[in-house]
From Swiss-Prot:
Function: PPIase that acts as a histone chaperone. Histone proline isomerase that increases the rate of cis-trans isomerization at prolines on the histone H3 N-terminal tail. Proline isomerization influences H3 methylation thereby regulating gene expression.
Enzyme class per UniProt: isomerase
Pfam families with a match to the protein in the record: FKBP_C, NPL
Matches recorded under Gene3D superfamilies: 3.10.50.40, Nucleoplasmin core domain
GO MF annotation terms: peptidyl-prolyl cis-trans isomerase activity
Bias (Acidic residues): 141-173
Family, similarity comment: Belongs to the FKBP-type PPIase family. FKBP3/4 subfamily.
Compositionally biased region (Basic and acidic residues): 180-190, 196-270
Assembly mode: Binds to histones H3 and H4.
Protein name according to UniProt: FK506-binding protein 4
Superkingdom of the source species: Eukaryota
Protein species of origin: Rhizopus delemar (strain RA 99-880 / ATCC MYA-4621 / FGSC 9543 / NRRL 43880)
Length: 382
């Protein structure tokens, strides 16, 4: 069962409308605008993966509406356009899975995963280090998945596909649940205290860097003032009346420049997007290059917190956390919130419980119905 919300777009001939899909939606109807000119033929096209396709062609008084059934998923780059003389209205709906279906599937996966993790830990040598355990849990299945993908060209294609699907189901509760074997619960608590101590000097450094940018700006007018005072000493008395005019002009010009520059820099940092499913995406830094898509392997740094500020998980050094985007290897809030990021980009994701760990939570660190806050940074994508 799915939850549906209205989606709509008005196409104007000569203009294109591009986006990276952040929430799946379905187009169900294309219609001519009410003020369409008679006899003017208009076509609707969509560009996907650098290939253009015509969805329909509408003609006033002949074909004014055309039912459609086209769905676009998260991470796809799509561009809509209209060619002709008339405006076109595209309508449809967003599509999200119901919470109850997600929780039933998640509970079955969680129980199976816990059994598999316990069996796997029993097979490890008693002197295995924490780093060996993490690599075994996070890296082993990923390496096997890549190798199986490269070999799927023979008669065993069906069998290898089934193995990949089972591995993805076991990895679904990443990034938190995979790092919680029973032997590491005590170590996580000590890491949380270190994370809180590390965050304080980082905040102090950012505060110190801000006034450093303002100091050279204030020193500029100070250098100009003594020069202006020396000039009237050499000049005659009637020219002293012109001094206040010369002082006022540069001050008026410099003040708006100082105010405009920080405003332009702050605008992209505070870009906030709220999706109909409750996910809030705040772009802190945009990054450079192409946007990441579904199916790409991305490397991430992150800090996971509860709404009260308590840190429950993080990856801030060492090997970045990597996963296949849009393949269900992480919580839904990550698949939706990271899509469209660029290398070096930073975001703050506020993820509601239905897109995280739902009513069950992930004891003991994540309570039931918990809203999670992640500070994420995209390091790489392949």
């Amino acid at each position: 069962m799915s939850v549906q919300g209205f989606w709509g777009l008005q196409l104007v001939p000569g203009k294109t409308y591009s986006q990276v899909v952040s929430a799946p939606f379905r187009i169900t109807m294309a219609s001519l605008a009410a003020d369409a000119e008679a006899g003017k033929r208009t076509s609707v096209s969509v560009l996907v993966d650098e290939k253009e396709f015509v969805l329909c062609t509408l003609v006033p008084n002949k074909i004014e509406q055309q039912p459609l059934d086209i769905t676009f998923v998260e991470g796809e780059e799509v561009t809509f356009s209209a060619k002709g003389q008339n405006n076109i209205h595209l309508t449809g709906n967003y599509v999200f899975q119901d919470d109850e279906d997600d929780e039933m599937g998640a509970s079955m996966i969680d129980s199976d995963e816990e059994d598999n993790v316990e069996d796997f830990l029993k097979k490890l040598p008693p002197n295995a280090s924490k780093e060996d355990i993490n690599k075994a849990l996070l890296g082993l299945e990923v390496d096997e998945e890549i190798e199986s993908d490269e070999e799927v060209e023979s008669d065993e294609e069906i069998e290898s596909d089934e193995e990949i699907e089972s591995e993805e189901e076991e990895e679904e509760p990443v990034p938190v649940s995979k790092k919680r074997p029973a032997e590491e619960v005590k170590e996580i608590a000590s890491k949380k205290q270190k994370a809180e101590k590390k965050e304080q000097p980082k905040k102090e450094k950012s505060k110190k860097e801000e006034p450093k940018k303002e100091e050279p700006k204030k020193e500029q007018p100070k250098k100009e003032e003594p020069k202006k005072k020396e000039e009237p000493k050499k000049k005659e008395e009637p020219k002293k009346k012109e001094e206040p005019k010369k002082k006022e002009e540069p001050k008026k010009k410099e003040e708006p420049k100082k105010k405009e520059e920080p405003k332009k820099k702050e605008e992209p940092k505070k870009k906030i997007t709220k999706l109909p499913n409750g996910l809030i995406i705040e772009d802190i830094k945009m990054g450079e290059g192409a946007s990441c898509k579904n199916g790409q392997r991305v490397g991430m740094r992150y800090i996971g917190k509860l709404t009260n500020g308590k840190v429950f998980d993080k990856n801030v050094s060492g090997k970045p956390f990597s996963f296949l985007l849009g393949r269900g290897e992480v919580i839904k809030g990550w698949d939706l919130g990271i899509a469209g990021m660029k290398a070096g980009g930073e975001r703050k994701l506020t993820i509601p419980a239905p897109l995280a760990y739902g009513k069950r939570g992930a004891p003991p660190d994540i309570p039931k119905n918990a809203t999670l806050v992640f500070d994420v940074k995209l390091l790489s994508m392949k």
